[in-house]
A protein has these predicted regions:
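Bacterial N-terminal signal peptides that target proteins for export
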Residues: 1-13
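Bacterial N-terminal signal peptides
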Residues: 11-22
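Beta-lactamase-like hydrolase cores
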Residues: 26-70, 320, 324
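Structured C-terminal helix/loop/strand segments within mature extracytoplasmic catalytic/sensor domains
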Residues: 29-41, 148-150, 200-355
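Mid-domain, small-residue-enriched loop/turn segments at the edges of structured enzyme/sensor domains
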Residues: 50, 122, 143-225
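Acidic helix-start/capping segments at beta-turn-to-alpha-helix junctions
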Residues: 58-59, 97-114, 148-150, 172-176, ...
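Active-site SXXK
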Residues: 61, 72-101, 292
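Active-site-proximal loop and beta-strand segments within enzyme catalytic domains
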Residues: 88-131
Length: 355
């Protein structure tokens, strides 16, 4: 990105001192954010492309955003919407992890994943299909999940939790089964905003699957996690923790932090197109959980190596944010359903999706 345009991408840092903070603590807090602002701007200035991001620490008021409400191409990050819909369906008894889905001859598609190399017909459990979709971003598995739950139902689910700009358009590398919106040509497989993708990942991390009994329609009041919720979220969060592609958000965090013990400290889902690299992640810092949704697009580097500039830029931004907010490093022991954050502990004061 050219330095002359930098002002258009300056991050908005929301870190207001809450009532009761001492002056010394408030000054130190702002000093951290000032340093983070400088570092983020330097990373942006060096990148040959565009950047949109949203990050928030869930148990504090740390927040950073750059074009966070701008609709962007999600690439495979839209698969998080499929995962969340599946989680709710399993929790409500309309789907089961061990139900069988069959990949028939001629249904496999190429690109990321491995199922297109397998002989067909092939029978897989729903859990296996979703695991392949998340861990290796398998496109064939994604289409199997879409066939199971339906595009309209998946989109209705995201809309019901306040994600108005998050939309799955079609199956991967398959013709659309009906008319497509006019903006399909711009976004391809799916669209969202960094803020909405972060909110979706937060729903998964907090294990918010059910509305409060009697909650008015359209409200984001979720029931506290119970044992049945946790059982579902344990499975889904395990998929995200075992993400195979770790060259973006985890890249410098895991290699630099030797204090992580007792579990994986990052759960994430990546997305890639020729000119797009993206990652949406939960990062468990010793100071508390963070959600990051970082999108680079219109990138000059179209290469498909681990040193692609978009991937490295995401890694640098993630390291800057996490290091500023959790100088002590990561803590994998806390990456469990609910994220160890009590109801009402987030910066929003509710735990509801923050629009």
């Amino acid at each position: 990105m050219r330095s002359g345009r930098l002002r258009n991408y300056l991050p908005t840092l929301a870190l207001c001192a809450v009532a009761g903070l001492g002056a010394a603590r408030a000054v130190a807090q702002h000093s951290v954010e000032d340093g983070l602002t400088v570092e983020i701007n330097q990373i942006i200035a060096a990148h040959h492309g565009k950047i949109a991001l949203y990050a928030r620490q869930l148990n504090s008021q740390h927040e950073v955003e750059i074009d966070s409400t701008k609709p962007v191409q999600t690439a495979s990050d839209i698969k998080l919407a499929i995962l969340y819909d599946a989680m709710v369906e399993v929790r409500e008894g309309r789907a089961k992890w061990d139900e069988r889905l069959t990949l028939k001859p001629g249904e496999a598609v190429g690109g990321s994943g491995m199922l297109h190399f397998f002989d067909t017909p092939l029978s897989l459990t729903l859990k296996d299909v979703l695991t392949m979709m998340v861990v290796v971003s398998d496109n064939t598995a994604t289409n199997m999940a879409i066939d199971r739950f339906g595009i309209d139902a998946i989109n209705a689910r995201t809309e019901s939790v306040g994600l108005a700009n998050t939309h799955l358009y079609k199956k991967v590398f398959k013709p659309a089964e009906g008319p497509l919106p006019a903006d399909y040509a711009t976004f391809g497989l799916g669209k969202s905003t960094p803020r909405e993708m972060a909110n979706l990942m937060e729903l998964i991390g907090r294990c918010e699957l059910r509305r409060q009994p009697g909650a008015p329609a359209g409200t984001m009041d979720f029931a506290p996690m119970d044992a049945d919720d946790k059982a579902v979220c344990d499975v889904a969060l395990g998929m995200l923790e075992n993400q195979f592609y770790r060259e973006t958000v985890p890249r410098y965090l895991e290699s630099a932090d030797v204090t992580t013990t007792g579990g994986v400290a990052i759960a994430s889902k990546t997305g890639s197109l020729d000119a797009v690299r993206a990652d949406v992640a939960i990062v468990m810092g010793k100071t508390g959980p963070m959600v990051l949704a970082i999108f680079t697009y219109d990138n000059a580097d179209h290469g498909w190596t681990v040193d692609n500039e978009g991937e490295v830029t995401i890694a640098k931004l993630a390291k800057a944010i996490v290091t500023a907010w959790s100088p002590g490093g990561l803590d994998g022991k806390l990456l469990v359903p609910g994220l160890g954050v009590a109801d009402g502990a987030s910066a929003t004061g509710t735990g509801a999706v923050k629009k």
